[in-house]
């Protein structure tokens, strides 16, 4: 898009539109941030600072920090200082109570509900986001499993099934997210113990696998046994992805 040139040496692409959200999950890159870092000053001055950054994010960041409009033909009377980019502020997926954290932490409070029926429900008896404590694993055991969390998750899944009754749909009602494969296997094992065959069809996976899908209820098992594990969960775009994947309420 940016490099194509016409026979006259001018930009071959007169206008293009990119729609996305760089504050949600990026593409999966095997290298860590240090390995993909770019140190060439010429490239860094052009906005290319890390190979993990998408073209969308690089352009957005450049336009935010640039004092001049890179695309002068896109002048807007309503936003003269940001003529080449804007934000879509209406979301129709989450109830406002679920969206509140992501809205404040990632979008500066600018997200507004469309006003769809599931967003307008006002049930004072429902707490739409709940944080439950769990016991860490004993010293010397694997940091990538937590039996206490797995049992809690299985019990919540069973409660959700009982609450929904005949309307429970394993592919739409409930999803369980956790960062480690070992914890996924442990949660599935605990769910089988519940003796509810319908729960065997629910998706238990990492947040990357949930990208683009949604559920009424999301259970997030952090599986943090030691303080050092917190830095592995510090990717804010992943945490944002967890909230965006939820429709009605979240029960970690």
Locations of regions flagged by a protein language model:
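Conserved helicase motor core of SF1/SF2 NTP-dependent helicases
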Residues: 1-251
């Amino acid at each position: 898009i940016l490099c194509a040139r016409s026979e006259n040496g001018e930009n071959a692409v007169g206008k293009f539109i990119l729609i996305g959200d760089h504050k949600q999950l990026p593409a999966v890159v095997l290298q860590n941030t240090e390995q993909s870092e770019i140190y060439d000053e010429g490239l860094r001055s052009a906005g290319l600072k890390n190979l993990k950054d998408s073209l969308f994010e690089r352009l957005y960041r450049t336009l935010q920090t640039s004092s001049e409009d890179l695309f002068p033909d896109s002048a807007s009377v309503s936003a003269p200082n940001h003529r080449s980019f804007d934000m879509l502020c209406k979301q129709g997926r989450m109830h406002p109570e679920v969206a509140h954290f992501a809205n404040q932490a990632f979008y500066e409070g600018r997200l507004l509900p469309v006003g769809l029926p599931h967003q307008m429900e006002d049930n004072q008896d429902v707490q739409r986001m709940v944080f439950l404590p769990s016991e860490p694993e004993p010293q010397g055991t694997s940091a990538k499993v937590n039996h206490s969390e797995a049992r809690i998750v299985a019990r919540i899944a069973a409660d959700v099934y009982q609450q929904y009754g005949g309307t429970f749909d394993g592919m739409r009602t409930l999803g369980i997210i956790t960062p480690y494969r070992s914890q996924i296997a442990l949660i599935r094992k605990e769910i089988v113990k519940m003796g509810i065959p319908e729960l065997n069809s629910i998706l238990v996976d990492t947040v990357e696998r949930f990208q683009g899908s949604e559920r009424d209820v999301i259970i997030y098992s952090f599986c943090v046994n030691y303080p050092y594990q917190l830095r592995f969960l510090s990717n804010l775009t992943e945490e944002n992805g967890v909230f965006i994947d939820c429709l009605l309420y979240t029960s970690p």
